[in-house]
């Protein structure tokens, strides 16, 4: 039986989730909520969604909604995740789940008490391209791991964009840099210390962010992210005996891993698959008890802890050691 979902907000990111949802029978989008009934109604009609609510609490009061997808501004992620969990709903919350490790950890406490699933939505983690990359590194294909370098940026020119508002926890690190942090952690483990620089825009939000991270065994991580830079989207994993390069590591639209070794280049191509569909299917299977969630508490808390440390390093202008 498909899991009955409600969508909290009418954000643009929903389009990608809805496209993935149409490809699977694991879920059904039953309801959508916005801050006002008219907006929710128009959205529901445009997307063939049965129920529309003018207010998020109204959606949470619907007894037939089993799970919610939260795509609200970053500053509201933890708050509404907790409210949804307390209302008895399972929660798939868009990344980043939170900027505070303590807040994220507390949200998982609520999930545990309520017997509900909470998962952070990093869709790229579900894609076979990502899983193949991890396998290649783990198998020693490039020898001992030495460096993880990545970038994610685009030129955001709309001053009204919520991603450019400090009060809503926008910014380069929270919006796109979080992918780079997640990817480095996936490959190299948890950072031991970090250093960072940021460039602030008119609202005091970081429009450019660059960081260096030190991992165990002398592995170095470096990334840069931006909301006012030309579009860049890449991940490079360097070992003592080779390099793995991805020119679309996060969206995974045309999955391909380039292996550079011994002066030769091998292109490992994979079949394209919708990451959002895979994410939704894993979430639903975990709800039904037929699979474990790919992303859980430990990963989400560690991700928030790294982001906290990176912001602190940028603000202080010095290296920050993680406990």
Regions inferred by a protein language model and the residue ranges of each:
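Beta-loop-alpha module in the N-terminal Rossmann-like domain of NAD(P)-dependent dehydrogenases
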Residues: 47-110
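Predominantly a Rossmann-like dinucleotide-binding segment in NAD(P)-dependent oxidoreductases
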Residues: 124-197, 202, 317
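N-terminal Rossmann-like dinucleotide-binding module
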Residues: 1-47
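Hydrophobic residues in well-ordered beta-strands that form the structural core
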Residues: 53, 92-93, 118-120, 149, ...
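Rossmann-fold dehydrogenase core element
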Residues: 105-124, 143-146
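C-terminal helix-rich "cap/oligomerization" subdomain common to oxidoreductases
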Residues: 1-2, 67-69, 105, 268, ...
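Contiguous beta-strand/loop segments that form the cofactor/metal-binding neighborhood of enzyme cores
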Residues: 182-252, 270-273, 280-291
């Amino acid at each position: 039986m498909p899991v009955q979902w409600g969508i909290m907000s009418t954000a643009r990111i929903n389009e990608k989730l809805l496209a993935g949802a149409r490809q699977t029978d694991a879920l059904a989008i039953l309801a959508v909520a916005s801050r006002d009934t008219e907006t929710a109604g128009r959205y529901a009609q445009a997307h063939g969604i049965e129920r529309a609510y003018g207010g998020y609490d109204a959606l949470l009061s619907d007894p037939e909604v089993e799970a919610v997808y939260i795509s609200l501004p970053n500053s509201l992620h933890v708050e509404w995740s907790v409210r949804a969990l307390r209302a008895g709903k399972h929660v798939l919350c868009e990344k980043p789940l939170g900027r505070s490790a303590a807040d994220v950890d507390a949200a998982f406490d609520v999930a545990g008490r309520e017997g509900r699933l909470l998962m952070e939505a990093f869709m790229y983690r579900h894609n076979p391209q990502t899983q193949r990359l991890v396998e290649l590194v783990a198998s020693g294909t490039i020898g001992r791991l030495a460096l993880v370098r990545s970038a994610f940026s685009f030129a955001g020119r709309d001053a009204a964009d919520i991603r450019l508002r400090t009060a809503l926890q926008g910014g380069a690190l929270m919006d796109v840099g979080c992918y780079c942090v997640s990817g480095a952690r996936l490959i190299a483990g948890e950072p031991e210390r970090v250093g960072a620089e940021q460039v602030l825009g008119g609202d005091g939000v970081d429009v450019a962010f660059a960081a260096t991270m030190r991992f165990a065994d002398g592995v170095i991580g470096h990334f840069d992210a931006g909301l006012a830079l030309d579009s860049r989207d890449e991940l490079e994993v360097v070992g003592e005996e080779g390099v793995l390069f991805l020119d679309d590591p996060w969206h995974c639209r045309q999955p391909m891993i380039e292996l550079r070794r011994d002066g030769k280049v091998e292109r490992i191509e994979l079949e394209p698959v919708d990451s959002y569909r895979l994410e939704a299917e894993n979430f639903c299977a975990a709800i039904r008890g037929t699979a474990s969630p790919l992303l859980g508490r430990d990963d989400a808390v560690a991700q928030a802890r790294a982001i906290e440390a990176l912001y602190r390093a940028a603000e202080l202008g010095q290296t920050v050691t993680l406990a």
